[in-house]
């Protein structure tokens, strides 16, 4: 039993303790720097969006339709919260917003802006801006944790946020909202890396809650990405239990 505990304590899945608080790429200063960097990168890549948030849409195809639906979800959240996907489309059919891509999560996130301004264009643009910004930051957060490198996180974040595939979806808000699956994966990584101990610490369970919250949020923001993140999480779980945890690898030796 002692050998087993020693193995788990020193297994690859157990994070090592480092005192990096004084380094530029570590701690709260690094978080602030990364957030600022990806905010500026998003301004550059989406220009002139930031100076036309109130009255600009990328095109006249999907964006006006999505913006209108976001407004309906925000109104329903106040006046008809049990029927968030209800609108006049295809009356008398109910929940017609849900016939297309799932927008429930985005509508809830954008609701406070709509309540304050009544401007669905502003809601659409802020959510669109945030999707690029947080896509970069979420990938930076994950890669910086896995590699310990601030620069590697920046590079990975730029690729994830502004790759031709993602940037090409600029006018399709549900498909730009890919950031939550990476936050979800980050929470899962931190949860599985928590030291094996009894009883579990509160922080351990907070990481599990972090994972579940963002997993569900991603599914509510884009139904397509619910399948993407299920595959992503499944692949990571297979990798972790086969190679990092030592639970399977030890048996092979």
Segments predicted by a language model, with ranges:
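Membrane-interface starts of transmembrane alpha-helices
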Residues: 29-33, 115, 119-127, 148-156
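Membrane-embedded helix bundles of polyisoprenyl
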Residues: 38, 127-195, 203-245
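Membrane-interfacial entry segments at the cytosolic side of transmembrane helices
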Residues: 28-29, 202-206, 246-253
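Generic alpha-helical secondary structure signal
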Residues: 35, 100-111, 153, 157, ...
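Basic polycationic patches enriched in arginine
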Residues: 4, 198-200
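Transmembrane helix-loop junctions in multipass membrane proteins, especially transporters and channels
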Residues: 50-54, 119, 194-198, 241-252
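Membrane-interface coil-to-helix junctions
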Residues: 41-135, 163-178
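Start-transfer (signal-anchor) and selected internal transmembrane alpha helices
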Residues: 1-47
């Amino acid at each position: 039993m002692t050998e087993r505990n020693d193995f788990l304590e020193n297994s690859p899945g157990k994070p090592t303790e480092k005192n990096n608080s004084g380094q530029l790429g570590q701690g709260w200063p690094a978080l602030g720097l990364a957030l600022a960097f990806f905010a500026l990168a998003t301004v550059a890549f989406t220009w002139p969006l930031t100076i036309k948030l109130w009255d600009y849409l990328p095109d006249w195809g999907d964006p006006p339709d999505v913006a209108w639906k976001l407004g309906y979800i925000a109104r329903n959240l106040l006046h008809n919260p049990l029927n968030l996907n209800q609108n006049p489309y295809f009356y008398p059919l109910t929940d017609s917003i849900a016939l297309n891509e799932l927008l429930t999560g985005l509508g809830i996130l954008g609701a406070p802006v709509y309540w304050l301004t009544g401007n669905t264009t502003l809601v659409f643009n802020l959510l669109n801006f945030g999707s690029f910004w947080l896509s970069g930051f979420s990938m930076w957060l994950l890669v910086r944790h896995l590699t310990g490198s601030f620069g590697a996180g920046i590079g990975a974040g730029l690729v994830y946020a502004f790759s031709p595939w993602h940037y090409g979806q600029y006018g399709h808000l549900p498909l730009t909202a890919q950031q939550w699956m990476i936050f979800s994966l980050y929470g899962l990584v931190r949860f599985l890396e928590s030291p094996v101990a009894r009883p579990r610490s509160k922080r351990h369970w907070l990481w599990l809650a972090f994972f579940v919250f963002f997993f569900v949020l991603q599914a509510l923001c884009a139904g397509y990405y619910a399948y993407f993140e299920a595959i992503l999480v499944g692949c990571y779980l297979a990798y972790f239990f086969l190679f990092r945890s030592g639970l399977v690898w030890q048996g092979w030796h």
